[in-house]
Amino acid sequence: MRGLKCQKGRLGCLVMTLAGFIFYAFGVFYYSLLKEAPSVWHIVCEKDSGQTEEDYERVMKTWEKDRQEKDFPLACAFWKKEEGQTAENLSLNRTCDVTVWKVRGSLEVLVQSSAVLNEDDWQGCYLAEDTAWELFGSTEAAGNKIVCGQRRLTVRGVLKDETSLLVMRPETKETTDRIALGMTLAAHVKGFLMSYGLRGKPMSSGFLAEIAQWLLLLYPGVLAAGFLKSLKNDYPVWAAGKILWWIMLAAMVYLLFRNIKIPETMIPGKWSDFQFWKDWWKSFQEQIVCFVQMDKTKRELRQAGIFMKSAVCSAMPFFIIALKKEVCQ
């Protein structure tokens, strides 16, 4: 009876070990989604440096050339956000509250859905799906007319992944206070700002993938240390269990090498360059604070959700280790 109970306990420990590996695999999966997600740099301009239409056109004149020669972002948008606005369908006498984005440049760098407006289409707009429902009772709203502020607009399409949003082109005299840049490196963002004499603080959600990968490195390290410690003991009965653990460790290492890549921002000229690590840590802390404080689009909120899933899955194996100490002792 005692031997049977002992075997059941060992089987339970193996099951929990496998469960920890499964959680870890999901953590790697969510990390891979986060790594592949397009990261957008948001630049909030200083209060006295709003961008006019002339500023935007000046950038666009040399955009294609600079993109190829200086590895500048593939897309950019100059925009501003106006909250607490009202959109109205006069024919049905329906209104709803919306946040208005007035955008010069690429819309797709800001919204997750496919959306295209001509640069001079001041009478066109896009509506979020729920906004279209409130105004028209349907998401088939293209071609319908609405009023927002002093402007009469024609709906060009519906944004499926956004909420309470209306996107339009700003009028000629309007200034914008934000810049969005498509996926690129931090160094390229700084080069972009310097090249065009723009001022503002860059912010991005790309650092979330860096945090996620560091969390994923912890469990294999702890597991390897435990395996090395277990080699000092001789438990013939546990030979199969040890083999299983080594297989799991090898699988984790394979997943790590296949999916994790150390970003260039974390590679110093010399590993003993302590000033580099000090500056990197300071910059990393600033990114976290900026991300918490920044106005997030649906894309950033979705990436934050994926990060949380990866972080939870990375932490679950440690919870299982603690549980095993209680069950398997």
Cite the ranges covered by each PLM segment:
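Hydrophobic secretory-pathway targeting helix
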Residues: M1-S39, Q329
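Solvent-exposed, non-transmembrane alpha-helical starts
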Residues: Q51-D55, D121-Q123, E162-V167
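The feature marks short, hydrophobic/small-residue-biased sequence motifs that occur predominantly
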Residues: A75-E119
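Mid-to-C-terminal secondary-structure elements
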Residues: V103-S114, L127-S195, G200-G206
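A cross-kingdom feature of multi-pass membrane systems that activates on extracytoplasmic/periplasmic
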Residues: L181-L228, K261-K309
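Juxtamembrane interface at the cytosolic side of transmembrane helices
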Residues: W214-E264, I320-Q329
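Hydrophobic alpha-helical transmembrane segments of polytopic membrane proteins
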Residues: S310-F319
